[in-house]
Amino acid sequence: MSTAPKDIETLIDLMARLPGLGPRSARRAVLFLLGKNRRLLAPLGEAMTAVAQTARDCLNCGNIGTSDICDICTSEKRATGEICVVEDVADLWAMERAGVFKGRYHVLGGTLSALDAVGPEELRIPKLRDRAVSEGATEIILALGATVDGQTTAHYIAEALEGTGVAVTSLAQGVPIGGELDYLDDGTITAALRARKSF
C-alpha cells in the first residue's frame, strides 16, 4: 500500500513506464523532484506539454520535428543524392551528433522481425523505394544494427531497391575506436577482419 498522495503516485506510475525506469527508479526520480529540486517540476511539465502538442513525425523521412516536413528534409544545405536509412529516431540523432553525414535520412521505425510479426509495410520500406526513385537518390546507406533482424532488414531493402539504379551501401562493422580485441565478441572480430582495408 502506497503512502504517497494519489497525484504523486500517478506520476510515479507514469514515469515507471519509461525505458530504463522501473517502479523504484521512478519513485526515486519523483522524490528527487519533490525534494530540493522542486523548481524543475513546472518547467518539466511545461516542456512535456509543449512536446505533446507540437511534436510530429516528418511525413517524408519519419524524423521527429515540429512541422509536417522536418528541418533536415527542407534544408537546402543537405545532399539530396544520399539517403541514410536508420532503424529509429535515436539512431538519426546519433548520426547527426557525429556530424559527418550531410545527406538526408529515412527512419524505418524498427526492423523486420518474424518473431514479432513486423513486416515491410510496418517499417516504411515501400516509402523508401518511392523516395529513392522520386528524389533521384544515387546512394542508400544502410545504417542498421549488426543484429540478425538488422541484417535481415538490410538484405530485404537491398533486394527491394534492385532495378532502381541506386547504389546500396552499409556502414562498416568491426573494432570500435578505443576497443581492445580481448574484449570483443567473435562476431565483431569476424566482421572487422572481413571489412579490413589497406593501411
From Swiss-Prot:
Coiled-coil residues: none
Q: What does this protein do?
A: May play a role in DNA repair. It seems to be involved in an RecBC-independent recombinational process of DNA repair. It may act with RecF and RecO.
- Keywords in UniProt for this one? DNA damage, DNA recombination, DNA repair, Metal-binding, Zinc, Zinc-finger
**InterPro entries linked to this entry:** DNA_Rcmb_RecR, Rcmb_RecR, TOPRIM_dom, TOPRIM_RecR
- The record places its C4-type zinc fingers at 58-73
Which gene codes for it?
A: recR
Organism in which the protein naturally occurs: Dinoroseobacter shibae (strain DSM 16493 / NCIMB 14021 / DFL 12)
Presence of the UniProt keyword tRNA processing in the record: no
Domain (Toprim): residue spans on this chain: 81-176
- Top-rank lineage group of the source organism: Bacteria
The family classification in the record reads: Belongs to the RecR family.
What is the name of this protein?
A: Recombination protein RecR
Q: Which CDD domains does UniProt cross-reference here?
A: TOPRIM_recR
Q: Which GO terms describe its biological process?
A: DNA recombination; DNA repair
Which Pfam families does the UniProt record give? Answer: RecR_C (PF21175), RecR_HhH (PF21176), Toprim_4 (PF13662)
| Keyword Cell inner membrane assigned | no
Query: Molecular function (GO) terms listed?
Result: DNA binding; zinc ion binding
| PROSITE patterns membership | TOPRIM
